């Protein structure tokens, strides 16, 4: 922690000219704040976002874990970058008690490894109750491998998700899009916990009461199924598989 008589020259906050030392809360917070708003728009390693408002694309330069606190947003306009949060073949874990809302224009991606293929690509993991919302663009989430351990995901884009492999062990997923709920680029691997209920609809923005109970196979029906909802639910007599 920096004080008037002892300023850490390596502290990215307090070493600045005329810095407010009373705001110093230690190197850990200073480094997190620096990483959250890096001048070149890059992040790597362990990063904490707390009530961040980001308006330029962010790109990973190494495997990264983002811990969310409070309400965080990334909103980008039509830029040269493809994704609001670009994984660039890296692995990304998003965790924490906070939320992240990503809003992008047409043809752009939300949280994505935009150039993944059948041979290379990173893994996107959501856990610890993180709340993820995506709005607009081509894909909400796009990665070769997506793992949802827990959390609440509300994805509304051209496709809510684009992936070759989706694993879901807990949490709540609502994915919808005008093209489809889930796109199966380079594969249709699914591993969805048997304790979770899968609902589907051939309509975009469908309400759960209007959806039918399905199976993992329905999450691969790329062009037909426009909305997918997966969560732990109590059985309802009105829901019939394949109805």
Per-segment meaning from a language model:
Residues 1-31:
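Thrombospondin type-1
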């Amino acid at each position: 922690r920096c004080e008037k008589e002892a300023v850490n020259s390596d502290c990215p906050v307090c070493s600045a000219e005329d810095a407010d030392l009373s705001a110093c809360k230690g190197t850990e917070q200073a480094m997190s704040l620096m990483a959250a708003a890096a001048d070149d728009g890059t992040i790597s390693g362990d990063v904490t976002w707390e009530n961040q408002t980001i308006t330029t694309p962010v790109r990973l330069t190494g495997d990264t874990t983002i811990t969310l606190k409070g309400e965080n947003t990334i909103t980008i306009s039509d830029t040269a970058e493809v994704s609001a949060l670009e994984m660039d073949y890296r692995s990304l874990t998003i965790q924490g008690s906070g939320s992240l809302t990503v809003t992008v224009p047409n043809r752009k991606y939300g949280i994505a490894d935009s150039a993944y293929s059948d041979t290379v690509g990173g893994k996107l993991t959501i856990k610890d109750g993180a709340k993820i919302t995506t709005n607009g663009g081509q894909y909400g989430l796009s990665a070769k491998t997506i793992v949802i351990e827990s959390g609440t995901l509300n994805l509304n884009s051209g496709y809510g998700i684009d992936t070759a492999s989706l694993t879901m062990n807990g949490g709540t997923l609502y994915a919808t899009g005008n093209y489809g709920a889930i796109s199966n680029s380079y594969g249709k691997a699914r591993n969805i916990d048997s304790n979770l209920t899968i609902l589907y609809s051939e309509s975009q923005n469908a309400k759960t009461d209007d959806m039918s109970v399905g199976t993992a196979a329905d999450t691969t029906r790329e062009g037909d199924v426009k909305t997918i909802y997966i969560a732990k639910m109590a059985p309802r007599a009105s829901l019939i598989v394949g109805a």
